[in-house]
Swiss-Prot record:
Acts as a ribosome collision sensor. Detects stalled/collided disomes (pairs of ribosomes where the leading ribosome is stalled and a second ribosome has collided with it) and endonucleolytically cleaves mRNA at the 5' boundary of the stalled ribosome. Stalled/collided disomes form a new interface (primarily via the 30S subunits) that binds SmrB. Cleaved mRNA becomes available for tmRNA ligation, leading to ribosomal subunit dissociation and rescue of stalled ribosomes. Belongs to the SmrB family. This is Ribosome rescue factor SmrB. SUPFAM superfamilies: SMR domain-like. It is an enzyme of class 3 (hydrolase). One of its GO terms (biological process) is rescue of stalled ribosome. It comes from Shewanella baltica (strain OS185). Its EC number is 3.1.-.-. One of its GO terms (molecular function) is rRNA binding. Associates with collided ribosomes, but not with correctly translating polysomes. Pfam families: Smr.
């Protein structure tokens, strides 16, 4: 086949369908598609992340020594247990390579997953150095109502590059 045959065939086809009107569809009325379950869950996660985690809030966190925080009313022994590694994290979140907005969503999803799975402790790896996530993650965790405490992770769970987080899972008996 060459281009002349194609042009000829196209001209013949155009001559055949000249004057034909498309049939209008008047029998079926289409509804707009409903949102999928995944879209709804994503919107809920974004709403939770935005409502819990403010970038402007500056809590009083230690400048020197290991990063740590304990919610008011929680026994200080819990912080010591986190530091020693008595709590084994059930879930691990690695935030390497995430943008700030993505990290917020992942953090909110991790906390929801901990509550859903009745996981008392989780580990969040934010990375070494003085990057933005290393600074922001503790500030976001302080703002979440389900977080009871966090401490810099022991060496086997990431050391300076990670935090062990203690989650309030409700009135269920604690696991270790």
């Amino acid at each position: 086949m060459n281009k002349d045959d194609d042009k000829e065939g196209l001209a013949m086809f155009s001559a055949l369908i000249d004057g034909i009107k498309p049939i209008t569809q008047n029998k079926r009325h289409f509804r707009t598609p409903l949102k999928t379950k995944q879209e709804i869950e994503l919107k809920e996660q974004q709403l939770h992340a935005n409502s819990y985690f403010s970038d402007t809030y500056q809590p009083l966190l230690p400048v020197q020594g290991p990063m740590r925080w304990l919610e008011e009313g929680v026994d200080s022994l819990e912080l010591k247990r986190l530091r020693r590694g008595d709590y084994q994290p059930d879930l691990l979140l690695d935030l390497h390579g995430y943008r700030q907005s993505e990290a917020k969503l992942e953090l909110a999803a991790l906390i929801q997953a901990c509550v859903k799975q009745q996981s008392l402790c989780c580990c969040i790896m934010h990375g070494y150095g003085s990057g933005i996530l290393k600074q922001q993650v503790p500030m976001w965790l302080v703002q979440h109502p389900m977080v009871k405490a966090f401490h810099q992770a022991p060496k086997e769970w990431g050391g300076d590059a990670a935090l062990l987080v203690l989650i309030d899972i409700g009135e269920q008996p604690h696991r270790r």
